[in-house]
Amino acid sequence: YLAAVRDAEVALPEEISRELPAIVSAAKPDCEQQQWITLGDSTELVMVTSMMTGKRAESFPDTTECFTMNQGKLWVTLPYDLEEHFRRRLPTCNDSTECRMRLVQLLGLPPTCNYDCLLIFYADAKSIIRPTPDNETTDHEAELCFPDAATAEYREWFEKNVQSSYHSNFPYPWTRLGYTYDWNCDTPSHIGPGEFIVKKGATVKIARKVDCWTWYKELSTKK
């Protein structure tokens, strides 16, 4: 894991993926698996998923209504993208422990984290960014440098996250290239699913809360 952190700290041009999933609009989904809903005021929400503890998942209200997410920002992936990457890397799981740890690795999370649940929800697409120097979500690759349009606020957040990711007591292999770092030593590629951030204050709607093992068992029955 620490080797992954050191590797991720240096982002190289050859590490750029040109196949990142994009978030554009309900009228122009990136693929047929991408799920959207449109509210009465024309706000468009796309389905995303975030791994967390079951306790934190339960802190989100059990409601079928939309609400404003005030719990802070969430790092997320797109459900179908997570499923595709997981199935390619681990076609079969022996038990819940193996399943959970493989998800932790795939998402670039520390081995000591106790996440065991997936929160699947819809989020306002306009409140989602890609955690890269150019943070738009509508294309399929990231840039290595900030565009002129990058705000001072975003640049400051980005640089602070660089410091906390690589130079703190709790480091993360943040790629800054729009995908997670899969740190499993036997993985054919360290390029994980595309990652995004849902900002605090976003309009969201909970789809479901599911433990990792149940998620995998359901995934294993899909064709």
Question: How would you describe each model-predicted region?
Answer:
Residues 77-80, 122-124:
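Short His-Asn-centered micro-motif
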Residues 53, 81-84, 126-129:
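Solvent-exposed loop/turn segments at secondary-structure junctions
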Residues 1-77:
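ADP-ribose/NAD+-binding catalytic cleft of ART/PARP-like enzymes
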Residues 98-104:
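A Trp-anchored, charged/polar loop motif used as the substrate-binding/catalytic surface
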